[in-house]
């Protein structure tokens, strides 16, 4: 008796695979010719909570409109209509991540040693004075007389 002979049993592999509802590109449905980079409210729907552009498989946009959408978002970010990062990152600043190595390794203890201040020794050096003979300008400009 083969599998085809058993009408009450499901096909091999059990239940059928889950097939999600096919997503339709909202720009194609609305017949949008150009995606406006100035419409930040519409563009914000295609940005994740971390400030990244959502992929096609999540938003359902077609390849053509996904490229145009990415360019519009980048243009809006460049002229400061949209943020590059999400709001919680802007509010908190650069938050250090947890590092288990840093937490497990104790900080080195500095031995409290008596540190004596450095003593500066200044040696006096005698510099001989050199006297140069300076001629007045009037005498220096006269040519030497030949005898």
Curated annotation (Swiss-Prot):
PROSITE patterns membership: RIBOSOMAL_S18
Keywords: Ribonucleoprotein, Ribosomal protein, RNA-binding, rRNA-binding
SUPFAM superfamilies, sorted: Ribosomal protein S18 (SSF46911)
GO BP, sorted A to Z: translation
Pfam families (UniProt xref): Ribosomal_S18
Record carries keyword Isomerase: no
Entry function: Binds as a heterodimer with protein bS6 to the central domain of the 16S rRNA, where it helps stabilize the platform of the 30S subunit.
Family as reported in the entry's similarity comment: Belongs to the bacterial ribosomal protein bS18 family.
Name assigned to this protein: Small ribosomal subunit protein bS18
Native species: Dehalococcoides mccartyi (strain ATCC BAA-2100 / JCM 16839 / KCTC 5957 / BAV1)
């Amino acid at each position: 008796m083969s599998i085809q002979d058993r009408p009450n049993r499901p096909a091999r592999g059990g239940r059928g695979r889950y097939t999600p509802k096919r997503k339709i590109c909202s720009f194609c449905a609305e017949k949008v010719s150009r995606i406006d980079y100035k419409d930040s409210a519409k563009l914000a729907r295609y940005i994740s909570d971390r400030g990244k552009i959502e992929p096609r498989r999540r938003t359902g946009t077609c390849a053509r409109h996904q490229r145009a959408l990415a360019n519009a978002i980048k243009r809006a970010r460049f002229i400061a209509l949209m943020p590059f990062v999400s709001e919680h990152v802007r509010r908190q600043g650069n938050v250090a991540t947890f590092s288990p190595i840093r937490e497990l390794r104790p900080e080195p203890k500095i031995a409290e040693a008596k540190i004596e201040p450095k003593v500066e020794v200044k040696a006096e050096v005698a510099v001989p004075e050199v006297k140069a003979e300076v001629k007045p300008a009037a005498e220096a400009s006269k040519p030497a007389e030949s005898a």
